[in-house]
Amino acid sequence: MKKTLAALIVGAFAASAANAAVVYNNEGTNVELGGRLSIIAEQSNSTIKDQKQQHGALRNQSSRFHIKATHNFGDGFYAQGYLETRLVSAQSGTESDNFGHIITKYAYVTLGNKAFGEVKLGRAKTIADGITSAEDKEYGVLNNSKYIPTNGNTVGYTFKGIDGLVLGANYLLAQERNKYGTGVGEVTSQSISNGVQVGAKYDANNIIVGIAYGRTNYREDVSQQDDAGKKQQVNGALSTLGYRFSDLGLLVSLDSGYAKTKNYKDKHEKRYFVSPGFQYELMEDTNLYGNFKYERNSVDQGKKEREHAVLFGVDHKLHKQVLTYIEGAYARTRTTTRDTTKNTSTVKTEKEKSVGVGLRVYF
């Protein structure tokens, strides 16, 4: 029977987890090690911030390592600890290959039951992370975190007791606090103070439906006089609707989002996007994918931004643990700024193009 596109994509992204090495398995305790090394060769150019040069690079692309320990108590109850690290650029230095530092991306503990769901505590993904359906390896044109945070310091609940259905809720806590000065221990300016989000996604019987809503509060640091215009709260929503034509190996989807940002002593901002996309199985172990995005961000009687972006890519599994791909993206942003005192407007257009060839080796 022909493999469905979803199965291939899930297999490609979950290879490190599904094929992780079991280093210990005894009396209900299981410890796994896994990860991937990823390299991308790319060419890009941009007119953002008046940059006019073209750049080539050979760099790390989200290489990672994880360890997962699961302890089964019996009667479906379990506890789990998970730690994932990433290779990133050094905070100080000029290296551009993104291999400078190792950071902790996720670190959390889970208590759960197969029938009743699980509670997760720590630095982890939220329910908003998996809502949209668009596929990408590196140059994703969607930025869901502008609408709802997709990870953070969280207490979350997830229920997967019904086949194909995932229900989730998260409460976000502050993750960044001042270490120096008079505000030691206070949440840093413009970082998350707290937030809440809920979501649901159904993926079964060739139908994909998902929606999430979140309200996130940010520290605006109002004691500073120059904080007018800094965001205080973001109310956002994300949704997806898709259908999988199993016989054709084709998935078509439509992602969308809306957010309203409340700014301190300033006019509020509104943004939304719509993004149709597709994923197509060209042949066994080879997939074609792409999506288009239109996004608009506006302030009443103020600055307006419109972005058009498109992405296409092809990936191929050389081996169950080796994935290669070619991906390219183009984005065009048009910004209109209105000067109410002079009753004039200025328009600026920025463009960004990128294309890359990548290789991932899972272990």
Swiss-Prot record:
This is Outer membrane protein P2. PANTHER family: OUTER MEMBRANE PORIN F-RELATED (PTHR34501:SF2), PROTEIN YDDL-RELATED (PTHR34501). It is a multi-pass membrane protein. GO terms for biological process: monoatomic ion transport. Belongs to the Gram-negative porin family. Gene3D superfamilies: Porin (2.40.160.10). Homotrimer. Pfam families: Porin_4. Its main location: membrane. CDD domains: gram_neg_porins. It is found in: Cell outer membrane. The gene is ompP2. It comes from the Bacteria. It comes from Haemophilus influenzae. Keywords: Cell outer membrane, Ion transport, Membrane, Porin, Signal, Transmembrane, Transmembrane beta strand, Transport. One of its GO terms (cellular component) is cell outer membrane. Forms pores that allow passive diffusion of small molecules across the outer membrane. InterPro entries: Gram-neg_bact_OMP, Gram_neg_porin_domain, Porin_dom_sf.
